[in-house]
Structures are given as structure tokens and as C-alpha cells.
Amino acid sequence: LMHKILHTRHKRKIAYKHYKGKSKIGFLFFSGFNSDMMGTKAIRLYNWCKKNKYQCTLFDYSGHGKSSEKFIDSSITEWIEDSNEVLNKVTSAPQILIGSSMGGWIAIKIGLLNPKKTKGIITIAAAPDFTKRLWKNELSLKQKKDIIKNGFITIPSEYDNEGYIITKKNIDAGNKNLILTAKTLEIKHPLRLIHGDKDEAVSWKESLKIFNKCKSLNAELIIIKNGDHRLSNNKQLEKIILTSQSLFDEVKR
């Protein structure tokens, strides 16, 4: 898959793939933390869009995949900036924002920042405010001390043999971008929240929190029986595509 480079106003180079398509509405995909546009869900969405001639855009956050910067120097603040520029400089139609894990958090931030350019939002195993949850509930006192002392720690991950780097910078940036602290979320767009009931990484109750706080009257919480955090088996991918198709049909009118 050939990619292009977007030079952002923050002097970062963001790798992206854009299929122009023939549709009046496009899909913009936001990957998870430590993931990139070569992920299973991203590729599946892109191929499905191409088959149907729907506009589709994939990209890598800075510090991820083929984009510039080091992961350790990047945070959700930069990733939201990157996402915003991709939406406004690469895509040419109103978009359905579709975000996986941390990408669900970012998709909602982007929807809040761009209400006119957003047509709908789909989240898959959304991880809103996960940095706050990590700090509060998951890191030990020793891990917190190490982060404060060294600026980062590495924690083991079942998704990456080298583990995840958790930085002080990203914990702090997360606190500036929280969405669940507000009483209501000004999301008025159609919203589809897909989550597995067996998600060990992020409870489906996180999607329920978004569901309860959003202003949208057209919101659906879709719980996948026995679904894990990845939601990447064939049946689950099919469900994501079906949800994308029905939302597309609904908002294109």
C-alpha cells in the first residue's frame, strides 16, 4: 500500500493513504495507541471502501508507523493535531469518523472540533481518557515513581513483544484532553459504539459512559458477545463493515 506525506503546520510529516472514491461522504479511520494504518481493521475498511467507491482515508499519528517523530516524544495532544489536519487537508467530503481503541477517544475529540465536517462517528472498543484510568487504577506506586523520575516506563503488552512505552508527557497530555469529565458530550452526530463484552483491556462500560453523556438522539451501543479488545476476527470485522454501511446509508440522504 503506497502512502503519501502530509506536511503539517507543526512541521511533522504524517503518512497517509487516501482513496478519493465517488461518494459524497467519506470514512476517516483513527488507529489505536501504538497501532498504525496497516492494522487489520484499517485495511479491511479501506478495501471495502475501494470496492464500493467510497472515499476513505487512513493515516499514522506522529511517532507511529511511517510518520515522523519518535513515539517517546509524542502524545495525544499531537495525535489530535495530526488527526485534525488530516481531516481538514486530506479529505474532501464530510466524513464518518471511525476510531479504534484510543482512536475512538480521538474521533470524538475531532467530532467536537469539527461538527460541520463530521457526518457520524463509529467507535470500536473505545478507550476514552485511558491515560487517566491507567494512572489512577493500573500503574503501581513504583511505576508512577519511575515515570516521574525517568519520564517514561515500558509495560508488557499482549499486543506487542517489546511492550508499551508510557510517558509522563502522554499522561499529562491525556489530562488536558479528557472527554468523560464533562457532564454532557456535545456530540449530536449519529453515533455507533461497538464493544466486546470480554474486552480485557478496556471495559465496554467505557463505551456506555460515552453513550450516556452524548447529546445525540441517534446513538447505538453495540455489545459483541465474547468480543475481545481487538474485534478482528472475520465475524467481528463483518459487523464493523455492516455498521459502517448502515450508518453511511443513513447519513448520505
Segments predicted by a language model, with ranges:
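N-terminal cap/lid segment of alpha/beta-hydrolase-fold proteins
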Residues: L1-G21
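Short beta-strand element of the alpha/beta-hydrolase
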Residues: K24-G32
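The serine-hydrolase catalytic nucleophile loop
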Residues: F33-Y46, K205
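Conserved alpha/beta-hydrolase
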Residues: A42, Y46-S68
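Catalytic nucleophile-loop/oxyanion-hole region of alpha/beta-hydrolase
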Residues: G65-V90
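Short beta-strand immediately N-terminal to the catalytic nucleophile in serine-hydrolase-like folds
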Residues: L97-G99, I124
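Gly/Ala-rich beta-loop-alpha elbow adjacent to hydrolase catalytic centers
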Residues: G99-A107
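The alpha/beta-hydrolase serine catalytic core
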Residues: K117-I223, D228-R253
